[in-house]
């Protein structure tokens, strides 16, 4: 089996269906005795250029170890799913398991947020509720 990095972009109106899509596509990989090394849901992000008059899309990244047949099946599923705007499948030499730069930036941003910020937000939410 070979290692692949898969990124697909979903129509922003279909964002609530992304967990189901991830489960379905993960099932294709695992049904063929493949392994998912990394799975990251990046959420809605700004597009570099409009696609079908859209300016945002929901991004998902997967690093998998799979057979060529299961990757072909996955690409076919992407092609026939109208909610998938774009997809890219790249073969890699080794399994990538560490967090992507996108995930690292999000974790770093979350860690920089101090507990006092949370307390201030809770207090303002309580004031707004009254």
UniProtKB/Swiss-Prot annotation:
Known role: Binds together with bS18 to 16S ribosomal RNA.
Family matches, as Gene3D superfamilies: 3.30.70.60
Keywords, sorted A to Z: Ribonucleoprotein, Ribosomal protein, RNA-binding, rRNA-binding
MF terms in GO: small ribosomal subunit rRNA binding; structural constituent of ribosome
Family note: Belongs to the bacterial ribosomal protein bS6 family.
One CC-aspect GO term: cytosolic small ribosomal subunit
Gene: rpsF
Organism: Shewanella denitrificans (strain OS217 / ATCC BAA-1090 / DSM 15013)
Lineage: superkingdom: Bacteria
GO process annotations (BP): translation
Name of this protein: Small ribosomal subunit protein bS6
């Amino acid at each position: 089996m070979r290692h692949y990095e898969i990124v697909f972009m979903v129509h922003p109106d279909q964002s609530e269906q992304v967990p189901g899509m991830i489960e379905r596509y993960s099932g294709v990989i695992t049904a063929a005795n493949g392994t998912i090394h990394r799975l990251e849901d990046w959420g809605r992000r700004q597009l570099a250029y409009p696609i079908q008059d859209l300016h945002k899309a929901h991004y998902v990244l997967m690093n998998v170890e799979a057979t060529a047949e299961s990757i072909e099946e996955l690409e076919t599923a992407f092609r026939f799913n109208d909610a998938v705007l774009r997809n890219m499948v790249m073969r890699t030499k080794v399994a990538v398991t560490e967090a992507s730069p996108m995930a690292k930036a999000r974790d770093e941003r979350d860690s920089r947020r101090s507990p006092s910020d949370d307390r201030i937000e809770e207090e303002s939410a309580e004031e707004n509720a009254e």
